Each structure stands twice: as C-alpha cells, then as structure tokens.
Amino acid sequence: MRFRLNDSFSGKSWTIDNVQWTPQNLVAWIMELNIGLSDEAKLLLPNGMSLNETVLNSESDVVIYVLDQNLLTFTYDGDKIPSIPSLKGQPISNVLTGIIADSSSDQWKDKISKCLSLLSDILESSSKIHNQLSVCHDEYSTSIVSPEVAMNYLQRRQSGMKDLLFVFYERLDRVSVSDLLHDFLALPTGSLPITPLKILSTNWTKLDSWLNSISARYAEAQKRVQQCIGAANSIIVSPFKEVPSIKEGDDAYYHLRSVAQDAANILQEILKIESTSTTSQIKPKCNYETEITDCMEKLQSNLSELKSSRKSSLISLKSFWLSFYKVSLRYDALYEYLRQIAEELDRSKFVLSQSRNIFSLYIDILMEALRRTEWQESYNVSHDSSLPLDQEKELSLRKSWLSHFSNLLFNHGQLKYLPVLTRDEISNYLLNIQAHPNYQTFHQMLSNRLSEYLGFPGSPREAVSNTVQANNSLHEKLAMYQNRCNNLEAMLSHQNGFNYNINNDGLSPNAPHPPINEQSNSSQPFYRVSPSIVPLNVIRKLTNRKTSFTDSHILRLQDEVNQLRNELDLVNKRNEDLLIELQGKEEKIQYLETENEEVLQKYENLQEELSSTRKLLTKNEAAVAEQQSNEEMHSNEPNILNLYSVFEGKVDSLQELYNAFKLQLTSLKQKGEYATLAKDAEAVQHIIEERDYALAEKADLLKLSENRKEQCKILTQKLYTIVFRCNELQSVLRECVTQPGFDSDNERDGHASIPDRQIEFNSKDLQYLYWMDGEDADRNFQEFLNRMSSLDFDSFHNFVVSVLTQAHNHELRWKREFQSNRDKALKAILDSQSKVSLRNFKQGSLVLFLPTRRTAGNKKVWAAFNVNAPHYYLNTQPHLKLESRDWMLGRVTSIEDRTADDSTDKWLRLPSGTIWHLVEAIDERF
C-alpha cells in the first residue's frame, strides 16, 4: 500500500510506499516525520471521516489530511526563484563563427568546452525550476481542497452528535429510585443481621436529584449542539481561485531541453574534428541563444505567477483555518461534555436496573454471607499447606462479587465485610416471611436459591412433600407384595400339606426371619438396595415439623431408612428363594417341545412348498417371456390357462394348509386344557406356569404364521405383475386371432399400438393387496385378480428412482456448500485473531498501546488506541521495557474497572467518579 500524508494548510506531503498497513506502523511513521504535531491533531480521509473511525481495506493508495493548529505557523517564501545561467557572454553562434574565421587558433576547443559546461548548468537549473513548479502546483492544489475536507468533517460530527442526542433521549428513564425501593425498605427482616438500610448507601436518597440533574444536562447538551451547529454555519468558505495551469511552463521546459541538447550535440561533433578546416561544413540549424532565453523566461514567469497566487491564497486560507479551529475546539469540548453525559447515563441505567432487581440482589447478599460463613468454618478446621492459595482465591472471588454492585446504591463497606449468617437463621426467616402475603414472590425466590445452594431440586418444603409422596407409594407397593407372598405361601402349604423351611429351599409364613448380612448389600444389584419405605409415624413427624432439617434429624432419618431397607432385603430374599423353586419346576414343561417340533416340521414343509412354487413361477415367467417372442403366440393360450389353473390350485393348497394349521393350534389348546384339568390339585401352580409357557409358544407360532402370511402377500404382489402381463398378452392374442390376414408384422404393429394405461391409486386399491386378511378369501382373491390389470410397476419404479436420484443430488450439493462455508468460517476466525481492536476491548483482544503526555511517578502513562472507547490505560510492567519504545501491540489478559478518585488518581486528570479501566496485556510480536 501507499500512504500520503498531506498538510492541510501548507499543502506539503509525505509519502511512504510498499507497506502493509497496521496502526503501529502508521503511528510510528508519523512520529518519525517530526513535523511538530500536537496531541489534538486530526487525521482525516478525503470524505471527512476520521482515521480512528475507519477500517482501511487493501487499497493501493491512501490519502490522509492532517488538521493541526500548530501547522498554521508555516511561512511561505514566494520571492526566491532559482536563477538560470545566461548565454549573453558566450553565444554558441559566435563561438562557431570565431572557429571558422580563425582556423589557425588553438583556443577553440577551450571555448567549446566552456559552452558545453554552460549548457549543462542551464539544463540542471531548469530542471530544478521545473521540479519546484510541480511541487508548488501540487501543494497549491492540496491546500485548496483541504477546506472542503474540513467542512465534511464538521458535518459528520454534527450528524453524529444529533444521533447521540437521540440515543440519549431514548435512554433517559424518568423514574424515582425511592418508589422502586419502597417495598424493599418495608421488608421485615426479623433477626437477620443484614437489613436493607445497612446494605444501602448513605447517599441513596440523593439519587433522584442526581437523575434529575442528568435530564437537565441533557437539555443543556441540546442547546450546546445547536450553538455549535450555528458556529459551524458561520464559517465563511470563500470561493478560492482555481489553481493556475503549469502547461506553459512544462512546454517551455521540454522545448529548452530539446534546444540545449541539439546545441550540445553540435559542439560534441566539432570536438571530434581534429582540424578546423572542415568546421565550415557544420552549420547551426537555429538561433539557440534566442530560443533558450525565451524558454527560460517563460519557465521563470510561470513559477513566479504560481507562487504569487499561492501566497495570496494562503492569506485567505489562514483566516478560514483560524475560524475552523475555534469551532473545532468547541466541538471537542461538546464531545467531552456528551461523553460525560453518556457515562452518567450508563451509571444511571445500572443503578435503575439494580433498583428494579433489588430483591434478587438482596438474596445474593444473603447467600454470599452464608457462603462466607461456611467457608470460614472450613478454613479454620483445615490445616492444609495450600491455605494461602485458598485465601488468595477467596479474596479475588469476593472482589469480583463486590464489583457487580453499584457504589452509588449499595454500601461497599458493609458488603465487603458481611456478618455471620447460618442456615438455621435463613430457615427461620423463611418461616417468618411466609406470613406476609406481599412478599410471597420474594419468599419463593429465596426458597429456590437456598434449595439450589443446599443441593435440593426444589425448596425444602417441596422436598419434604415429594419424599412423603414417594414413601407412601413405596409403602403401598410393599404391602401389595407382602399380600402376594402370603397368598402364594398359603397356596403352596395347602398343596403340599406342610411348611417348607429355609434349608429345603422353601418359605413359611410363620418361619423366623434369617439374620441380616450387612455385607450383602454391596453384592446385590442397585434395585435391591434402593431406599426403603418410610413408615407413617416418620412421615407424620416430618409433616408436623416446623423447623428446617438439621444434621441430627437427617442422621435419625437415615437410621430409620436403613432399618426399613434391611427388612425389605429379607422380603426380597424370600422372593428370590421362591423364584429358584419355580425355576427348578419349569424343567418339567420340556415335554411340550416334542409336540412343537411336529408343528415346526410342518412349517418347514410349507416353506419348501412355497420355495418350489416360487421356482415354478420363475420358470413360468421365463416361458411366458419366450412365448412373447414366438410368432405363433395364439397357440400358447391353453398353456396360459393351465398356468392360471395351477396358480389357483397352489393358492387353494396354501389355504388348506392354513386351515389345517389353525385346527392343529386348536387341538393343541384343547390338549393343554385337558391336561390341565387332569392334573392333581397340588400341581395347580405348575400347570399355570405350563399354560403360560404354552401361551408364549402359541404367541411365537402366531408370529411365525404372520411372517408366513407376509411372505404370501409378497408372493401375491409378485404374481400381480405376471397376471397383468398375461392379461395384456391375452387381449393382444384375441385381437390378432379375430383379425383376417394376420401376420407377424401386423402382430407387432398391433401390439405396439396398444395405448399405455396410467394407474391411479386409491385406498380401495391397496385393500386388494391384502386379500388374505378378509373373511371371504375367495371373493377377495377374485376381486384382487380383477384389479391386477390397473397397476403399473414400471411407472412406480421410475418414480421411486427419480426421487432417490434427486435426494442424492441434493446431498452432494449440500456437502459441497458445507465444505465451502466451513472454510470461510475458519478463514474468518483466523483473520479475527490477528485484527487490531479499536473498541469493545475484552480478554484476548489485540490492542495498540501508545504513550501519552501524562506521567505517574517517573513513568509515562500508556493508553489504548481507541475509537469512542476512552480511559483504557496499560498496567506498565518492568518486563515490557516501555522506556525505550514508542508503541506496543499487546494481547489483553484482563481488564479491571476502577473509579477515579482525586486523592489517589490525580495523574489521570479525570473528574471524580469517572470509571476508567486498568488493562493487563502481554507483548504480541509478529
């Protein structure tokens, strides 16, 4: 890139080429120029936009105008014009004439050398004059254009201030802090050591007057903006004269060079001649002295006119720039005034926001006091070597928490050292505040926060109610399970006539409970060691309790729960013994498997028949395809009818097999019932289990039957296409047989002339595909055959293929777009990591830091190069070595917000109460 820095008054310019723009390079280059710029200097683009507000792109040429009142001290010396040597003493034509007249003279070579030296001096002087003419013309043009750039700058600032006033008007919030805090001040605190009056600032009553003063300052800002606009309109921008043309001087300069070069060439030729006898043959082509003299006069006169015009324009420009800088200073003061109003508005919005959320902040303060109390207790108990680190971490945590509260509304001295607060005190306060209907929302908020802190999913009362409900449901389940076990034991004892003991793998309702093994819980699964049922007396105690949980209550409740869990483990163990007994008796049911094997064998035979039928149909389909290519197609009609009859026979056989299978299932069911009735009374329980097992086997057989039916349906759908093709072939054959003079060509033509039929699907058509589900299978099958000719599988296949192809194309296109978008996102992320931030500074931002005129002690104060983000100061560290540097590009590691204080922060020169930012950064080297 190429940068050109223009002095708006004198028109001087400084240029740097072939650089890649970065803020530090630009600032370092301007500082190296040492042109006497002040801190209030403004760098503008031709459109009047400030360089601080612009992000330059990769343009090849960038023009920057400098506006600074210190540059008005420039004095223009327009009288000094470089002189050009004269040819009157030794004209070239006289030299040539003297050489021709006095051929015997030996001094002609010296004269020619002097003439050549004179011509060289003339060319050098004219080149200097021409360069001065070009520079003067460029500076003149720059100084004439600069007022327009300055006025554009003022117009942009006017529009920006108007927009800022509009934003201020929208952000003004005309509410009273006293009204917002009325309910909070009336909040009953009981015995809490933290009250609303203690945490509020002593000057919170003055906040309403402070908010009113902001509104008054806004009205004053409106007046000042109008005054600045009027002052800007009063600046007289007189129409400046156009820059004189330098075309005449350019023409004279180039003509002078041409004539002088011709004369020098002639003299060089004369020097090459050894004798003067042939010099008469060289004739000058023109009068060199006259032409060179005329060109020199034109060049000097053009430069003189341009300098005089520029001198007069600088006089008129100086009055304009003096007026402009006066108005600009007013704009700067107004901008500082508006900036202070903006800061006050930000602080007021923060105060009003915290006033509206005062109850939530009060809850935060209570929970912070509780956290500090418990942390101090754990800190006093522990004796770890990392205590200093824990203390430092706690201090930083408290400092960060305190920074979230406004010092205008809250008393930071009280918040910094909160009193001791325990869980019992907060629990008692919750019970007391529940009696006040106006603070139910606050009660709910505090209950939720306390529940979150204690680890409950809800409030303590909700936790108790949920526990009671869960215990009631578990108690009901336990009673139900106990009744079932008692009934089962009674049934078994009635069947066997005696009680089983524990050693014989049996159970007795009157038998004593076995001892509890304390180590058995660890080996049991998780559902066996789940929390037991809480008895009703414990639930009544919990519901009648008015105080919150304590550690002793929780331990007592845990002991009772453990006892009940042990009782439930005994019941579970008895159930496991019963299950072991039942599993041993399930082995007797294996005799049913022999009967099931016969059924499975019949199913396998049926599957073989279906496979053979499928093969036969495949062969028949191939035969039909061959018959279509045969010229004597009418002779195959009996074969088609036979195939159709064979198909009907196969379907009838399948139907018979299905009916036989249903009869077999019925007989098996009857056999199972007869066997169950024939069993002895003492084996009733075993028969019930056997029946359940038989029912499960029946369900499996039914599923297998359904699978076979699905296979039959698939076979039917495949036969649909064959029948449709056969019907088409049959219709063609009939038409061909009835036509006289039938031949193969006519047959093919007639077959090709059959119009294609498009199939329209509806819900009734789909019913025919599942004809086997109906009651009247024969009638449904006949309807199914009648509808077969209306389905076109080719059209359906083409439609499905087109949809899948389109979906595949969409997938490929989306993959390419995803790859492209991902590359763009990665590139944007990499670009953002190396881009210098000018506002919205945060941790990880790349910031340019520059030294200021202010000093703190013996060190300079460094500030961040910003756009509408002032008061960001660098925390200077020795390892940064800033004493020998003019700039630093750093990566922000942390930002600490502070408030200006006249006693400690005098070096900032900021109003008291102004928020400024201390930035920690590390050096970023490229």
Curated annotation (Swiss-Prot):
Keywords: Autophagy, Coiled coil, Membrane, Phosphoprotein, Protein transport, Transport, Vacuole. The keyword Nucleus does not apply. The modification Phosphoserine is found at residues 548, 552. One of its GO terms (biological process) is reticulophagy. One of its GO terms (cellular component) is Atg1/ULK1 kinase complex. Homodimer and potential homooligomers. Interacts with taz1. Involved in cytoplasm to vacuole transport (Cvt), pexophagy, mitophagy and nucleophagy. Recruits mitochondria for their selective degradation via autophagy (mitophagy) during starvation. Works as scaffold proteins that recruit ATG proteins to the preautophagosome (PAS), the site of vesicle/autophagosome formation. Required for atg9 anterograde transport from the mitochondria to the PAS. Required for nitrogen starvation-induced sexual development and for entering the dormant G0 state. Belongs to the ATG11 family. This is Taz1-interacting factor 1.
